[in-house]
UniProtKB/Swiss-Prot annotation:
Binding site for Mg(2+): D232
Enzyme category, top tier: oxidoreductase
Keyword Calcium: no
GO molecular function list: isocitrate dehydrogenase (NAD+) activity; isocitrate dehydrogenase (NADP+) activity; magnesium ion binding; NAD binding
Residue numbers marked as site, Critical for catalysis: Y128, K175
Cofactor note: Binds 1 Mg(2+) or Mn(2+) ion per subunit.
Listed SMART domains: Iso_dh
Catalytic activity: D-threo-isocitrate + NADP(+) = 2-oxoglutarate + CO2 + NADPH
Protein encoded by which gene: icd
Functional summary from the UniProt entry: Catalyzes the oxidative decarboxylation of isocitrate to 2-oxoglutarate and carbon dioxide with the concomitant reduction of NADP(+).
Protein name, as recorded: Isocitrate dehydrogenase [NADP]
Amino acid sequence: MAAFTPITIAYGDGIGPEIMEAVLYILRKAEARISLETIEVGEKLYKKHYTSGISEESWDVIQRTGIILKAPITTPQSGGYKSLNVTIRKTLQLFANIRPVVSFYPFTRTLHPNLNLTIIRENEEDLYSGVEYRQTHNMYESMKLISHTGCKKIIRYAFEYAIKNNRKKVTCLTKDNIMKFSDGIFHRVFNEIAKEYPQINNEHYIIDIGTAKLATKPEIFDIIVTSNLYGDIISDVAAEISGSVGLAGSANIGQHYAMFEAVHGSAPDIAGKGIANPSGLLNAAIMMLVHIGQGDIASLIENAWKKTIEDGVHTFDIYNEHSSSKKVCTKEFAVEVIKRLGQLPITLPKAAYPLIVKKQESNIDYKIDTREVKKLVGTDIFINMHVFSAHDIADKINKLDIGNFELKTISSKGLKLWPHDSRFEIISDHWCCRFMNKDGTEIKHLDITMLLQSLSKANIDFIKVENLFEFDGVAWYSLAQGE
């Protein structure tokens, strides 16, 4: 008798419980070789003052099983609560988010019948690191964190995925014309790794034009690899133009753990009505079965699901009176899929997953390269001051004893306002004062400490210090507009 794989089940919020019940019903009837352990996460935990939406007991279950099938959850939009999705992905180091998007034309409505692409999204970094601050009465900050090792992991994963799944092209999307360091390193690593895969075509688009092309000509894409925020946005764009966000599932893959979920949210507006489409979570479950080596059950369910779609048995979100034959509720849809277990689709591609899946290389040991010579050459000190002119700030600072430093520039929101007059008056309470060593020698941390003491004695409210570094003689800090 084949061993049963333990799976953690999270019912989620909103429509989550009803679509999870439908999916588990199908899995039981298909005789999936899994054993279930249920955890409570999301809204109920937030209401119990778990700011992360998950308890220690649930973490113990996840650590024991290693695999999660999760329905959508609702994250409160205020009050300091953290996104549970982001927390799980980061805690379990699920660095790769895999979102296949396929058109099921002519059985679902879409303008893009040949749509068939996969979005591979970096899952741990970027603005989704969730590092944010309020610095002044007027200014808020969210940090975009991108690492060299993180870029290498996700980009190599994308090319390996292309090889494994017989894909022909990988497209990289960034905004490195503006964010030259963070998005720039993503693009540079993409170019470097692409050279190792000459059999795979590669290309790059700026995210705005890339998204426009995705919305109008998705057929030109095969695999898209991108960073966290961009990937989140374009995944929903792609799912929507496929015919319904409710059809798409996704996988979150790491070295030791994996989580499978629908792309769509918890849809509280239709919760409890029994009309939600369970297909997204079902497709996520199919991806899970493939991942754990139960390709036979995955194929059985996917073929039955496709036959159900072909037969025009649709939930309300994709129902079309001209092409659908029957409108069904969530539970009825599950029953219709179960009726077709063992049947094959006629028009849509038949699924035939292998029983034993070769695990994609996701445990490469990426070490931090420390060979570049790092030199501290200056510091940006951000201050909170209610003035209308950067000249007032410069006059005050230049009267202080600041040692071997000199004040080079003052800027606000990246616009240089001193030493030269600005064309326009800037209303701000958030100023960046750039200090460099007068003789160009390396700066010590003690020098910066003494500088901060001088500012403090003058009642200048410094709110952040960002040191400026050269690596192998190259300046790795941005210049203000106009500098």
